[in-house]
From Swiss-Prot:
NCBIfam families: rpmJ_bact. It holds the Pfam family Ribosomal_L36. This is Large ribosomal subunit protein bL36c. Keywords: Chloroplast, Plastid, Ribonucleoprotein, Ribosomal protein. HAMAP family: Ribosomal_bL36 (MF_00251). GO terms for molecular function: structural constituent of ribosome. One of its GO terms (biological process) is translation.
Length: 37
């Protein structure tokens, strides 16, 4: 899980979702997981 100021999709399978007022990226590839901090 990477904590970033700006989250973006890295590949085609990445999905932007909103959880507890935070933008997150979930993907089948664990390296692509991101959370906005």
């Amino acid at each position: 899980m990477k904590i970033r100021a700006s989250v973006r999709k890295i590949c085609e399978k990445c999905r932007l979702i909103r959880r507890r007022k935070r933008i997150m990226v979930i993907c089948f590839n664990p390296k692509h997981k991101q959370k906005q901090g």
